[in-house]
A protein has these predicted regions:
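Short acidic-glycine-tyrosine-enriched beta hairpin
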Residues: 73-89
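Short beta-strand segments in beta-sandwich/barrel cores
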Residues: 48-50, 66-71, 92
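A cytosolic small-molecule/anion-sensing beta-strand core signal
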Residues: 64-65, 80-81, 98
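Glycine- and acidic-residue-biased ligand/ion/polar-headgroup-sensing regions
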Residues: 57-73
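A short, N-terminal "cap"/entry segment at the start of jelly-roll beta-barrel domains
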Residues: 1-36, 71
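Conserved short histidine dyad/triad with adjacent acidic residue
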Residues: 23-26, 38-55, 89
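Ligand-binding loop in jelly-roll beta-barrel domains
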Residues: 89-113
Length: 115
């Protein structure tokens, strides 16, 4: 069993985001190309965003710190610490209303050869 402190990782990623010109930093804590499930801790500084992009598959977003806004062409959701949302299977963007950290969980089709 592997465990991690999401609180400590959130602080680490916020520190890295503050040093990055993009105003963001991320670390995958589970998954990758060999797994169907992927979890990523993503820090975004206030006023920065992940521009509109296609949905990577079935996904959820949980706010670990701060305040974020998830938008699609037809809808918008705002979340703060402890809030979560199922990301719709359409193009969307994520913006930080204040310095924020989220846990993004994505399920993608299993690669060939994995069962």
């Amino acid at each position: 069993m592997q465990s991690i402190s999401l609180t400590a990782l959130a602080e680490e990623q916020l520190t890295l985001a503050r040093q990055a010109r993009s105003g963001r930093a991320a670390r995958t804590i589970h998954g990758g190309h060999e797994h169907a499930l992927r979890q990523t801790v993503l820090a975004l500084l206030s006023g920065h965003e992940l521009a509109e992009h296609d949905s990577p598959g079935e996904a959820t977003l949980q706010v670990l710190r701060g305040h974020v806004r998830l938008t699609t062409a037809r809808d918008a959701w705002e979340g703060t610490v402890g809030d979560g949302v199922t990301i719709p299977p359409e193009r969307h963007a994520l913006a930080a209303v204040e310095d924020s950290v989220v846990l993004l969980t994505v399920v993608t089709p299993r690669p060939p050869g994995l069962s």
